């Protein structure tokens, strides 16, 4: 549930009483938030409040049949299939397809606008404009795309390819891979791993808040018998998870991307140097 940038999460089973209890807790929490805002001369924007259930399709169908709503102030909030969280569109199944489609559509619109003035500006300025209006949108919140199939993020890769063609003045039939290498651009799936590894590096060097570092555990902190060989390394433990959507969580995807890096990268303490070497590493994989 979202009210501007405030978020409330409640777990529930499919039991009717549990669902009723979850809705009541949401109502009580929003009432407390509204009262807190009012006491400080702030007003909770009820019209922007959104409600969504997240889970497997079969469970979501059963929840939808219960027809539950949540009351926030004088507004009745009904569940939506897609909600927006700080610019990231989250669908009930967390497939991220709507977010990818919306981002790709916005980026292509910006590219069409830039193409109209491409003949008036040079390559350097065009590159800066593409970074500002296109690549920044591809990279925003891209850690939520971790673990997705390449087919899902393919629209974003097509955006990047089109941006490279615009900068290099290539035709639609020209091969784009040499242009991407010349621009030193990582493919979209590597850009996602780059973000994950940057966050893991901040955890490893103690430069991140506790709410992020508490989600992962270093192997050396609590080595198991099977992990004694790697207890003296910078590896992080992956939690046991048997579902594809669970493996997309940062607690799993972060250590997975970090542990796959060469050990030489783990030893770099400086953030800027780490990012430079990390990009070089991913470019070498293309």
Model-derived features with residue positions:
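Hydrophobic/basic alpha-helical segments
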Residues: 1-286
């Amino acid at each position: 549930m979202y009210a501007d940038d405030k978020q409330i999460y409640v777990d529930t089973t499919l039991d009717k009483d549990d669902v009723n209890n979850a809705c009541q807790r949401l109502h009580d929490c929003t009432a407390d938030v509204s009262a807190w805002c009012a006491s400080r001369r702030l007003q909770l924007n009820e019209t922007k409040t959104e409600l969504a259930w997240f889970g497997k399709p079969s469970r979501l169908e059963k929840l939808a049949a219960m027809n539950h709503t949540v009351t926030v102030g004088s507004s009745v909030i009904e569940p939506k299939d897609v909600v927006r969280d700080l610019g990231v569109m989250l669908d009930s199944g967390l497939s991220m397809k709507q977010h990818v489609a919306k981002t790709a559509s916005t980026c292509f619109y910006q590219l069409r606008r830039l193409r109209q003035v491409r003949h008036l500006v040079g390559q350097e300025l065009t590159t800066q404009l593409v970074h500002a209006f296109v690549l920044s949108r591809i990279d925003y919140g891209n850690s939520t795309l971790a673990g997705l199939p390449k087919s899902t993020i393919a629209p974003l890769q097509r955006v990047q390819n089109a941006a490279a063609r615009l900068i290099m003045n290539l035709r639609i039939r020209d091969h784009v891979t040499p242009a991407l290498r010349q621009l030193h651009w990582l493919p979209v799936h590597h850009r996602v791993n780059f973000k994950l590894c940057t966050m893991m590096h901040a955890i490893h060097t103690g430069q991140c808040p506790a709410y992020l570092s508490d989600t992962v555990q270093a192997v050396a902190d609590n080595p198991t018998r099977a992990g004694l060989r790697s207890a003296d390394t910078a590896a992080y433990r992956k939690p046991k998870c048997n579902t594809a959507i669970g493996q997309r969580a940062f607690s799993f995807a972060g250590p997975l991307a970090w542990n796959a890096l060469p050990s030489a990268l783990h030893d770099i303490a400086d953030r800027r140097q780490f990012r430079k070497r990390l990009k070089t590493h991913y470019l070498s994989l293309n």
